[in-house]
Amino acid sequence: MAKKVEKLVKLQIPAGKATPAPPVGPALGQAGINIMGFTKEFNARTADQAGMIIPVVITVYEDKSFDFITKTPPAAVLLKKAAGVEKGSGTPNKTKVATVTRAQVQEIAETKMPDLNAANLESAMRMIEGTARSMGFTITD
């Protein structure tokens, strides 16, 4: 018989840098998870993606065991890295802060494809372009 799910915990943690300190510790402590077990496993699984923020969905079962799924980094984080900026524009309709090429958008869309609700690469690229525009980025060919 399948284990009964008690709780889902969603977090965004820097790859390879999960620690028992807030915000990770309190979120997992409330769910009754072995915090050190999670942090060691997460850090081992994400060590190759250093510097990126990784969304993780932790499934907690009734017997306090858990498993987790790591997702691809958020599109905004990938866009900022591609453009080489710290943050997007506060007023994207007036102030443009950076430029990304369609090739960079395609690369990001290919990376994000498993997590996007897109039928093909073209629609995934349009989603990423929309995120870029809302951050005050200009898209060039």
From Swiss-Prot:
Pfam families: Ribosomal_L11, Ribosomal_L11_N. GO terms for molecular function: large ribosomal subunit rRNA binding; structural constituent of ribosome. CDD domains: Ribosomal_L11. Signal peptide: none annotated. InterPro entries: Ribosomal_uL11 (IPR000911), Ribosomal_uL11_bac-typ (IPR006519), Ribosomal_uL11_C (IPR020783), Ribosomal_uL11_C_sf (IPR036769), Ribosomal_uL11_CS (IPR020785), Ribosomal_uL11_N (IPR020784), Ribosomal_uL11_N_sf (IPR036796). The keyword rRNA-binding applies. GO terms for biological process: translation. One or more lysine residues are methylated. Keywords: Methylation, Ribonucleoprotein, Ribosomal protein, RNA-binding, rRNA-binding. GO terms for cellular component: cytosolic large ribosomal subunit. Disulfide bonds: none annotated. The keyword Transferase does not apply. Gene3D superfamilies: Ribosomal protein L11, C-terminal domain (1.10.10.250), Ribosomal protein L11/L12, N-terminal domain (3.30.1550.10). PANTHER family: 60S RIBOSOMAL PROTEIN L12, LARGE RIBOSOMAL SUBUNIT PROTEIN UL11M. Forms part of the ribosomal stalk which helps the ribosome interact with GTP-bound translation factors. Belongs to the universal ribosomal protein uL11 family. Part of the ribosomal stalk of the 50S ribosomal subunit. Interacts with L10 and the large rRNA to form the base of the stalk. L10 forms an elongated spine to which L12 dimers bind in a sequential fashion forming a multimeric L10(L12)X complex. This is Large ribosomal subunit protein uL11. It comes from Streptococcus uberis (strain ATCC BAA-854 / 0140J). The lineage of its organism: Bacteria, Bacillati, Bacillota, Bacilli, Lactobacillales.
